[in-house]
């Protein structure tokens, strides 16, 4: 009976330790993820574009997401985007989806509006936290977010209809 009490006490202490560390872990993850970001540059097919050719704002906070982007890399074609979404995160997984998406393309003075989200439902990512760096990797391995206290680097190996490889560097503004 004495040993049973010791084992039970040890078990409950271990559970409390894991619960506290799990809570601290999710707080560390959220502190790196949540914030406001400004797009600094965009690399598409190994060509870097800076402001004013590209501009954008990303806000991730309290399970809500907002993104705006302007892409003016070609004088005859521009793309403007605004999206509202939701996300969920825990210490193992991150999910994000865009339930309201508006993409305005202007090419040779012709305007086209697309209101379809780039994917259905929520995209799933694995979560890795190491040395004050948060890495989110999609289950396909084609998209990733790397976040620290100063920045977010988003990489996509198949972005858009043309399936271009892009890297977007965002600085944290709050």
Please describe what each predicted stretch is:
Residues 20-174:
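Lipid interaction determinants
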